[in-house]
């Protein structure tokens, strides 16, 4: 036992020595860093344009009402961007209760694989020299409250979201390693019925805020927005929309995207295919396949 402890101590000391001797001259030369300059963490830009596709995503556009069923979703995504192709596996749990007046939602990326070029690496001030690796994403917790539903006034729902700082590989510019929060109101109105054709326009307006590494302005605040429409026929639905947010720093913090979702419901299950097309400050083209299990909500 004593010999084993000695071996472990020697091994740990060796790892510490090797880590201390790691050569960062390539990063220093690429960015003109000299002794006395701010540390590398201050060089990274905490905005969606300079991080991975899952770092500071635009929150999902909600539709003004709480869904009837509990949902468990497993999704596989492929993010296409020249110089930074990324793949991930994510999950979501949605639980309505109190007669569908309140719901909680939890979601996040379980596993992310990336492989970016030297150009992307240097543009983002990444410390990941070869630009290839894996990461775990941030996890999100949200609460939804139904304010109005099926009245003369449009369906109205309030949502508050908290983002944890659980994402890994900040040094590789994959995740922000900072907390964030947002709140929004979403609205919708139904026209027609699913048996013939249901048309449901919806919109969202809110506020999004996240911590940064800027010592003078440690928080970035943004206006959150979105609008779209559901076209539903029996068990099929198609939803085009656009969404984004406007950060006040204007340093790559104003992502805008188009969203398209085709969804099929069957036997308390559903399948979904989504396509997201980045327009500004988030330029990925994302394809996501989801399988959803549905259960009755909690009374």
Show the residue positions of the predicted features.
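Detector for outer-membrane/organellar transmembrane beta-barrel domains
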Residues: 176-247
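Transmembrane beta-barrel domains of Gram-negative outer membranes and organellar outer membranes
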Residues: 21-164, 181-188, 192, 236-240, ...
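Short acidic, gly/pro-rich beta-turn/loop elements at beta-sheet edges
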Residues: 84, 103, 116, 151-153, ...
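Structural signature of outer-membrane beta-barrel domains
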Residues: 79-81, 111-113, 161-167, 206-212, ...
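Surface-exposed cleft-lining segments at the edges of enzyme active sites
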Residues: 128-132, 165-176, 208-216
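Bacterial Sec-dependent N-terminal signal peptides
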Residues: 1-25
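Transmembrane beta-barrel outer-membrane domains
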Residues: 82-86, 132-138, 174-180, 196, ...
């Amino acid at each position: 036992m004593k010999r084993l402890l000695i071996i472990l101590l020697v091994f740990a000391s060796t790892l510490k020595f090797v880590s201390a001797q790691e050569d960062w001259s390539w990063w220093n030369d690429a960015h003109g860093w000299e002794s006395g300059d701010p540390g590398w963490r201050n060089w990274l830009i905490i905005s969606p344009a300079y991080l991975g596709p899952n770092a500071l995503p635009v929150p999902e556009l909600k539709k003004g009402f709480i869904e009837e069923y509990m949902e468990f979703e497993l999704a596989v995504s492929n993010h296409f961007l020249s110089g930074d192709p990324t793949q991930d596996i994510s999950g979501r749990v949605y639980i309505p209760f109190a007669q569908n007046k309140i719901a909680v939602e939890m979601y996040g990326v379980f596993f992310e694989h990336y492989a970016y070029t030297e150009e992307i690496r240097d543009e983002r001030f990444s410390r990941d020299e070869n630009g290839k690796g894996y990461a775990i994403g941030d996890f999100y917790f949200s609460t939804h409250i139904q304010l109005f539903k099926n009245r003369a006034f449009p369906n109205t729902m309030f949502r508050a979201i908290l983002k944890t700082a659980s994402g890994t590989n900040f040094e590789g510019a994959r995740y922000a390693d900072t907390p964030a929060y947002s709140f929004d109101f979403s609205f919708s109105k139904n026209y027609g019925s699913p048996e013939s054709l249901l048309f449901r326009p919806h919109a969202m307006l809110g506020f999004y805020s996240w911590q940064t590494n800027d010592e003078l302005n440690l928080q970035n605040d943004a206006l959150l927005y979105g609008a779209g429409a559901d076209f539903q026929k029996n068990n099929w639905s198609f939803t085009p929309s656009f969404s984004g947010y406007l950060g006040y720093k204007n340093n790559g913090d104003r992502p805008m995207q188009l969203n398209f979702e085709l969804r099929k419901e069957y036997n308390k299950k559903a399948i979904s295919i989504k396509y997201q097309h980045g327009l500004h400050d988030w330029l990925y083209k994302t394809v996501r396949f989801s399988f959803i299990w549905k259960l009755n909500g909690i009374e």
